[in-house]
UniProtKB/Swiss-Prot annotation:
Binds as a heterodimer with protein bS6 to the central domain of the 16S rRNA, where it helps stabilize the platform of the 30S subunit. The lineage of its organism: Bacteria, Pseudomonadati, Pseudomonadota, Gammaproteobacteria, Cardiobacteriales. InterPro entries: Ribosomal_bS18 (IPR001648), Ribosomal_bS18_CS (IPR018275), Ribosomal_bS18_sf (IPR036870). Part of the 30S ribosomal subunit. Forms a tight heterodimer with protein bS6. Belongs to the bacterial ribosomal protein bS18 family. Gene3D superfamilies: Ribosomal protein S18. One of its GO terms (molecular function) is small ribosomal subunit rRNA binding. This is Small ribosomal subunit protein bS18. Keywords: Ribonucleoprotein, Ribosomal protein, RNA-binding, rRNA-binding. GO terms for cellular component: cytosolic small ribosomal subunit. It comes from the Bacteria. It holds the Pfam family Ribosomal_S18.
Length: 71
């Protein structure tokens, strides 16, 4: 069974830089437990996956996103 190749959302939209203040976008790329979803699942290319990880970590540090889920 051949799987369909996932396309990078950020490349398709022509995004220059991922902003750590854009919480709606960042929440789409973290799991319920708070982990960053890997690129092989989302289809995000390497350039944007690095920016995404940095943005999520920055947002966590500034308490915009939680590190883990609510217990």
């Amino acid at each position: 069974m051949a799987r369909r190749k996932r396309i990078c959302r950020f490349t398709a939209e022509g995004v220059k830089e991922i902003d750590y203040k854009d919480l709606e976008t960042l929440k789409a790329y973290i799991t319920e437990v708070g982990k960053i979803v890997p690129a092989r699942i989302t289809g995000t290319n390497v350039f944007y996956q690095r920016q995404l990880a940095t943005a999520v970590k920055r947002a966590r540090f500034l308490a915009l996103l939680p590190y883990t889920d609510q217990h």
